[in-house]
Regions:
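Active-site-proximal specificity loops/subdomain of glycosyltransferases
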Residues: 48-89
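Conserved catalytic core of nucleotide-sugar-dependent glycosyltransferases
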Residues: 73, 102-183
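Short beta-strand-to-loop acidic/aromatic patch adjacent to the donor-nucleotide binding site
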Residues: 90-101
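C-terminal catalytic/acceptor-binding lobe
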Residues: 162-229
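Short, charged/polar "capping" segments at the starts of alpha-helices
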Residues: 17-19, 43-49
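Short, acidic, metal-binding catalytic loop of nucleotide-sugar glycosyltransferases
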Residues: 24-33
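Short beta-strand/loop segment that forms part of the nucleotide-sugar
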Residues: 34-43, 59-60
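N-proximal low-complexity "stem/linker" segments adjacent to membrane-targeting elements
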Residues: 1-24
Length: 229
């Protein structure tokens, strides 16, 4: 797969440090910074304007472009949908969370991919609550196919409301979990797209998935400093 065919997409939310170091890690592991689209979904802290010198920065603060669904995951998901349909011009989108760091294996992984053999590439599972989803932490999506088939990445009518009691990887789903990013998309493509399954841990370290939670940012960045410095 050629880097020139890929746009890296990430949504930043009130955290310039993680977004900046994610991009720094990407450039270090690839030896260059490919086309990147960073969407600012912040509510209190604007994205660092200096990012405009390196990437395309799209201002969606307070969801003034995509609309506010009053739930963070819904806003995140609708923003990705907007970007896939209207902003990304390359054949492929590499969707990543802004709190990931890339491993040295990334460059060979992308170079070895034959993009004629799949339509989407990622890991399927469920972490916070059912149902299964294509994790948005690292996922390659064929944007041309997505547009040609008039698909959606976000469907507000298929979001889980409060009261679901299924048992998930994190225990009983007693909180107000909603169907998170990548669920309805997987439902729509699982029987018609070629899905290449991978282990994300082969190419990234994700702050949340690797046990650092939402708060232990300093430990995450210190332990994995060699991936971006």
């Amino acid at each position: 797969m050629r880097l020139s065919d890929i746009t890296v997409l990430s949504v930043t939310f009130n955290n310039n440090l993680l977004t900046g170091l994610m991009l720094k890690s990407l450039a270090k592991q690839l030896g260059e910074l490919p086309e990147c689209l960073i969407i600012d979904n912040g509510t209190t802290l604007p994205a660092d304007e200096r990012l405009k010198d390196l990437v395309t920065l799209f201002d969606n603060r307070n969801q003034h472009v995509t609309g506010n669904y009053r739930q963070c995951s819904k806003n995140h998901c609708s923003t990705i949908d907007y970007a896939l349909k209207r902003l990304i011009k390359t054949k492929w989108c590499l969707l990543v969370d802004n709190d990931v760091l890339f491993k040295p294996t990334l460059k060979k992984f992308l170079a070895d991919l034959n993009d004629d053999e799949f339509d989407v590439c990622g890991e399927i599972g469920w972490d916070d609550a059912p149902p299964e989803r294509l994790f948005p932490y690292f996922c390659l999506i064929n944007v041309d196919k997505f547009k040609n088939e008039n698909l959606n990445y976000f469907d507000n009518d298929r979001c889980i409301g409060p009261g679901s009691k299924e048992i998930g990887a994190c225990g009983p789903n007693t909180k107000r979990w909603y169907k998170d990013t990548g669920c309805s998309f997987l439902e729509d493509i699982k029987d018609r797209w070629q899905i290449k399954l991978i282990k994300m841990s082969d190419v990234i370290i994700h702050k949340k998935s690797n046990g650092y939670g939402f708060t232990d940012e300093k430990t995450f960045l210190t332990v994995n400093k060699e991936l971006y410095s």
